[in-house]
Amino acid sequence: QFAWKLRQDPRVVCMEKTNIRYVTPQDIDDVLDFASVDVSFISLTKVLGPARELLADGGEMVCLIKPQFEAGREKVGKKGVVRDKSVHEEVIDKVILFAISIGFSVLHLEYSPIKGPEGNIEYLVHLKKEQDVEQAGMKENVDVQKVVEAAHGELDK
């Protein structure tokens, strides 16, 4: 799934099929300035901590929030699709609050214009690693409800 153009770029380290929870800074040749995270069948809250350790202070990360892997099973519908806007808001809030609690600032939130394979609406959160947890927080007015409403308005057609 990794774009061929990116795969060929010498600045890019593709870590497909890698359990990021077990990667240490010693496993990577350099401290990362940027990382993108797209995980399946696991909550982002399980991987943000280990991924944070790989970033330089001030490093940034864009993560794909997939409601179907953040919500409890009782909130996931047929074919693994989460349609309820309130569940989308709940899981985004959960991921954002967790990210802040471990020392990330939230720079931006947007919905992905591409639905997941089964039709799930997914979201992109842009994070920045702060030197210490006290500096973490929202760096812009991220309105989760507004982003979810816009996503459903555009993609529920």
Feature annotation, model-predicted:
Residues 1-46:
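S-adenosyl-L-methionine
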Residues 2, 66, 119:
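Residue-level signal for inorganic ion chemistry
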Residues 67-84:
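Short, glycine-/aromatic-enriched active-site segment of Class I SAM-dependent methyltransferases
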Residues 104-113:
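Conserved S-adenosyl-L-methionine
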Residues 45-62:
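A short glycine-rich, Lys/Arg-flanked "PGG" loop and its adjoining helix->strand segment in the class I
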Residues 20-21, 67-71, 113-114:
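Short "lid" loop at the C-terminus of a central beta-strand within the Rossmann-like core
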Residues 120-157:
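Flexible, glycine-/basic-rich loop-and-beta segments that form/coincide
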Residues 88-102:
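Short alpha-helix
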